[in-house]
Amino acid sequence: MSDPAKVRRHAERVRELVASVVRSQIKDPRLGMITITDARITADLRDATVFYTVLGDASAQASTAAALESAKGMVRSTVGKALGLRHSPTLTFVLDDVQDQVKHIDDLLAQARHADAEVQRLATRAEYAGEAQPYRLEEEPEGSGDEVPPPGGDQR
């Protein structure tokens, strides 16, 4: 199967099904506040990667990962039946670090804004390092440099 549109539709359907199963069928107390953010499936529809985020600290993320691993078989069975494919895709759950990347980029942008403000503040008090006009504007004396020498060199 190499139809990208069909693969995309199946990936979206896997995301919806996994979110539904996690919300309604998994009763594991280790499962935290989870959001299924994305799903990707291979072109042969055999392997699916499901991305999720968890609200909480590292321990909540670890316990949610353990809960998803223990419920992986039941989730795969439900997804396989709902998709109606010959083979149920193998599910791999991956913690989505988009929120961490967004925070890191926001921090970098804040640092850049702070540095720009500092440069702007220093520029308002800036003075010339030398004179205001560094190039000398002297009038040239008469007969210097404007005359063209006669052809053949200097004739005396």
UniProtKB/Swiss-Prot annotation:
Family note: Belongs to the RbfA family.
Region (Disordered): 124-156
GO molecular function: ribosomal small subunit binding
Taxonomic source organism: Salinispora tropica (strain ATCC BAA-916 / DSM 44818 / JCM 13857 / NBRC 105044 / CNB-440)
Keywords: Cytoplasm, Ribosome biogenesis
Function: One of several proteins that assist in the late maturation steps of the functional core of the 30S ribosomal subunit. Associates with free 30S ribosomal subunits (but not with 30S subunits that are part of 70S ribosomes or polysomes). Required for efficient processing of 16S rRNA. May interact with the 5'-terminal helix region of 16S rRNA.
Primary localization: cytoplasm
UniProt subunit comment: Monomer. Binds 30S ribosomal subunits, but not 50S ribosomal subunits or 70S ribosomes.
Gene Ontology biological process terms from the UniProt entry: maturation of SSU-rRNA
PANTHER family, per database record: RIBOSOME-BINDING FACTOR A, CHLOROPLASTIC-RELATED
Compartmental location: Cytoplasm
CC annotations in GO: cytosol
HAMAP family linked to this entry: RbfA
Database matches in Pfam families: RBFA
Protein name: Ribosome-binding factor A
